[in-house]
Amino acid sequence: QGLYWFDTQPSVAKAARDHAEQLREDPDTAWNEIVRRLKAAEGKGRGFFSHIHIAPDTAADIPDMDTVRLVIVHPRLRRRKNDGAESEVVKWIRAAVESKGAAQRTHRNTLVFLVADSDELERLENTTRNYLGWKMVQDSAEQLNLSKQQSNQADSWVNRLNDTINSNIRSTYMWMLYPEQVDPTRPFELVAEKTSDSDGKTLTERVFTKIKRDGQLITELAPTMLGMTLHSELGALWDRVDDMTVGDLWGYFTQYAYMPRLASRTVLDDALRSVIDVMLMPGEQFALATGKDEEGHYQGLILPPSSAATPPVVTDNTLVVKWEVAKAQLDADDALEAAYEDGEVIMASDHSETTIVSWPASRVTVVNNDAVSGVGVSEAEASSTAAVELPDIHYTGSVVIKSDRYVRMVNNIIEEVIDR
């Protein structure tokens, strides 16, 4: 006769498997476990972005701030390789960029998103359910009356699946998305780039490295690039104004997706402070001022480069001034100063006789072919002078350059002599 033996202890593998299957009907439980791990691993990654927003339930949970932040999208939203504008995750991200709840979002150029890959997420969800199944068995060892061997088996599976989940999260969250607007007259597009998990970095560091390498997050801004931005991306506005405050300029960087994405306000301030040492070319030129009086006269005006200037203290009220406007004021200031000074002279010669005339040329006065300095000429003397048109002959000349105003004086020479 056959003998049969019945094990009175439950099969721990079957108990874990049954619980994991039940969780298929409750996806929130697995998602909550994934989110918990994301917060534990990525919540301290603010050294790369000003803030990390992990799995916000709605776009209203993402603050409208003027600093660049990373949004790790909730695992209920996933991206397939060929997803278009009508996919659920793309529509959610677009809505998050455009609005914060019922209000329009102001700082649209400050958000970067990280999204799970659809295929990888399915594997992660399955692993997470299996982990939770074995975790239930481990936590219920006493109630299930598990043997020492069964408890060890549960512990082994929990540890193994725990490590697998952490590894799978890194390979699952691979899609970086951010708004880009090539044409300011058209709506922004969402650019999707895959990030690599081959370098052992956290998700936050991986995204930061990728977006910085792609030139989509600027951590250091050269003054020349800032000048080019004023003349190109902001050209339509820059052409209509004489100046703008740094506070307004920073707002343009954070609001519009066609502007470079600066990592922080410090990046802009550093570029402005360092411009005093940089020779700017046409298409890059701008000046700085601490303010302007009621008559529109700029105060603390700096026309780069300026060896005599000290790095300015940049505030929201600091003015970025159009180069031509700043130069016109400085030229007028120099002309007024020169009216009371001697020594800035040009030695001009027509190879027959030498004539001494004052600088700048706009103040040259000639009386009976004898040039006199415009400096200190009285109204009576000026009324008795007669302007004489010099013959079209060859002239040579020299000018004394002051070290504290060499840029403006050289520019004057170029405009008055070379460009004429």
Residue ranges and their predicted role:
Residues Q1-D419:
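Extended alpha-helical scaffold and adjacent linker segments that couple domains
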